[in-house]
């Protein structure tokens, strides 16, 4: 079996190793999770790609837009500890790599919503499973400084 799309790989792994499940049990909630992941990819990962490969002006505009959009959703993290959920899910797994790279991308979280978003990031980044998933290069992005 050869899989190549990150979401397909993540769902396959969740089904292959189902304990604990990272996708909701109920079909409607599963569909919502898939929509959230699609939106994260379409809206935010595309901005990350522009920051990394666009012109300086395009990167600056994408950096600003990404910061504003992330801060705009921050209130959801006052209602539930994870992305619209009481439980850590595949949506959190999908969003975490982007959030981990924010300092390298030059995206600084300041202003309204920053505290809530940083609290969410801390909850995700302190999970043993997240830390175990980091490559050496990813670890250096945040942990290897100093």
Question: Where do the PLM segments sit?
Answer:
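Short, thiol/selenol-centered motifs that function as redox-active sites or metal-ligating centers
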Residues: 3, 33, 92-93, 127
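GST superfamily/GST-like fold recognition
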Residues: 43, 83-108, 112-113, 118-124, ...
């Amino acid at each position: 079996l050869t899989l190549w799309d990150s979401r397909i790989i993540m769902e396959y792994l969740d089904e292959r190793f189902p304990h604990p499940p990272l996708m909701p049990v109920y079909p409607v909630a599963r569909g919502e999770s898939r929509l959230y992941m699609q939106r994260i990819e379409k809206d935010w990962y595309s901005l990350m790609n522009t920051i990394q490969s666009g012109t300086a002006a395009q990167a600056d505009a994408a950096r600003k837009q990404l910061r504003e959009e992330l801060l705009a959703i921050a209130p959801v993290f006052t209602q539930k500890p994870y992305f619209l959920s009481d439980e850590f899910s595949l949506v959190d797994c999908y969003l975490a790599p982007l959030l981990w790279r924010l300092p390298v991308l030059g995206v600084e979280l300041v202003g309204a919503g920053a505290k809530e978003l940083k609290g969410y990031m801390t909850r995700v980044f302190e999970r043993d499973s997240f830390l175990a998933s980091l490559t050496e290069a990813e670890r250096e992005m945040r942990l290897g400084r100093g």
